[in-house]
């Protein structure tokens, strides 16, 4: 199988990521994070960014094979250390208010067999060192977009019955192009219409200002409090310079932050989570007074426990996102083993940091003010999927009255 018009569609995709995604403007600095396997796409993205007037495009290459060898064999003190030159680059990008474009294509099993303690130590070090970048991103001080490209090992994981590696890659590219509306006659207009539909749902929820949400489904009975003056966001965002951008491509979600002090009950995952090169399945999380008091998993439990119990702020939630079961990604019936796609197939929660923009005025608040407003602060932000066609969600008003939001996995407001 050879995907028809692949080069033409890859060019359209690159243009979408640079224009609709990070929305490059003349004089912008762009930081592109991408795998070495995706050099063809990287070249197109760099070309498009400069064509729109970018002042500089900095490419940050990654390689799963090299990273795996490092995690397996490097001395532990090196794994726990973030070199000064990487911190200096981060400071440079912050100074330039660089737009960040991250293209994900990693093998979901890249670090399978690496000791979870080594992966956890590295993630903790990176989280602490790059905290200023995380804060700038999560408060939309800069434009940022997360997208995907069809890596060979990832494609083989998603399509194990493909007749060849080439066919698996083609099948995955086809899904990426489809969900990112590349095949539409006018992709830019298609994205605007899609964003408008999501914005309409966000407006309804913002006007309601529910006190809490109640989730029920097989394996789930969870109540999440919502902060005062919380803000539901959808596809588009605005950076500190007043420029629009799309944080995720694809996206199907409407999201906010729960009050991290008010989570009660239990919730079960409905799709695998790919985290730190490991697949985690069958997650069940129990909350009391906002805090995770127990977490189990059928596969990858040790990795999950390391995430939750060894990272500051990881015992509470930072995001709750609503995605209907009727979304195109869900209806494809494909498990992508990639959070960007799987989270846009279904309702999900995030362990760790909340986005500052999830409360009114949050982008200008200090860390202490955000925490006082009910927004969790952490060095990590990890989404896991909880939705299904059996999930019901109610909005609870301050007087205790309830309004159905989801029934059988779909919007009813």
Curated annotation (Swiss-Prot):
Entry cofactors: Co(2+); Zn(2+); Mg(2+)
Sites where the protein binds a divalent metal cation 2: 319, 343, 381, 383
Keyword terms, alphabetized: Aminopeptidase, Hydrolase, Metal-binding, Metalloprotease, Protease
Keyword Hydrolase on entry: yes
InterPro entries cross-referenced by the UniProt entry: M29_Exopeptidase (IPR052170), M29_N-terminal (IPR035097), Peptidase_M29 (IPR000787)
pH dependence, entry free text: Optimum pH is 7.5-8.5.
EC number(s) from the headed UniProt entry: 3.4.11.-
Coiled coil start-end: none
GO molecular function, a single term: metallopeptidase activity
Residues the entry annotates as binding a divalent metal cation 1: 253, 319, 343, 348
Cofactor binding comment, as recorded: Binds 2 divalent metal cations per subunit. Can use cobalt, zinc, and possibly also magnesium ions.
Function, in words: Exhibits a high specificity towards peptides possessing arginine or aromatic amino acids at the N-terminus. Could be involved both in bacterial growth by supplying amino acids.
Family the entry assigns: Belongs to the peptidase M29 family.
Self-association state and partner proteins as the record states: Monomer.
Protein name (record): Aminopeptidase PepS
Species this chain originates from: Streptococcus thermophilus
Gene that produces this protein: pepS
């Amino acid at each position: 199988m050879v995907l028809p018009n692949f080069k033409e569609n890859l060019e359209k995709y690159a243009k979408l990521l640079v224009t609709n995604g990070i929305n490059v403007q003349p004089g912008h600095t762009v930081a592109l994070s991408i795998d070495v396997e995706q050099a063809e796409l990287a070249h197109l993205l760099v070309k498009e960014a400069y064509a729109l007037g970018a002042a500089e495009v900095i490419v940050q290459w990654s390689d799963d094979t090299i990273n795996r060898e490092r995690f397996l064999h490097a001395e532990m003190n090196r794994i726990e250390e973030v070199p000064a030159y990487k911190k200096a680059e981060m400071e440079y990008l912050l100074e330039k208010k660089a737009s960040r474009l991250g293209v994900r294509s990693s093998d979901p099993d890249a670090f399978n067999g690496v000791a979870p303690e080594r992966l956890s130590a590295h993630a903790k070090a990176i989280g602490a060192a790059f905290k200023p970048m995380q804060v700038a991103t999560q408060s939309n001080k800069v434009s940022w977009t997360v997208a995907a490209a069809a890596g060979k090992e990832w494609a083989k994981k998603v399509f194990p019955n493909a007749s060849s590696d080439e066919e698996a890659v083609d099948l995955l590219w086809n899904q990426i192009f489809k969900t990112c509306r590349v095949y539409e006659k006018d992709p830019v207009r298609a994205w605007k219409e899609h964003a408008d539909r999501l914005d309409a749902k966000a407006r309804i929820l913002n006007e309601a200002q529910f006190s809490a949400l109640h989730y029920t489904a097989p394996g789930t009975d969870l109540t999440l409090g919502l902060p005062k003056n919380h803000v539901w966001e959808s596809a588009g965002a605005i950076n500190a310079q007043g420029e629009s951008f799309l944080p995720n491509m694809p996206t199907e979600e409407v999201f906010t932050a729960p009050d991290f002090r008010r989570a009660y009950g239990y919730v079960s995952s409905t799709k695998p989570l790919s985290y730190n090169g490991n697949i985690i399945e069958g997650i069940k999380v129990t909350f009391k007074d906002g805090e995770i008091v127990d977490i189990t998993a059928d596969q990858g439990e040790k990795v999950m426990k390391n995430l939750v119990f060894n990272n500051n702020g990881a015992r509470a939630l930072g995001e709750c996102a609503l995605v209907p079961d009727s979304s195109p990604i869900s209806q494809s019936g494909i498990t992508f083993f990639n959070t960007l796609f799987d989270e846009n197939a279904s309702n999900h929660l995030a362990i760790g940091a909340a986005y500052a923009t999830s409360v009114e005025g949050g982008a200008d608040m200090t860390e202490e003010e955000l925490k006082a407003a009910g927004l969790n602060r952490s060095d990590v932000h990890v989404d896991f999927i909880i939705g299904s066609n059996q999930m019901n969600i109610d909005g609870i008003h301050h007087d205790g009255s309830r309004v159905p939001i989801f029934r059988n996995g779909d919007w009813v407001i």
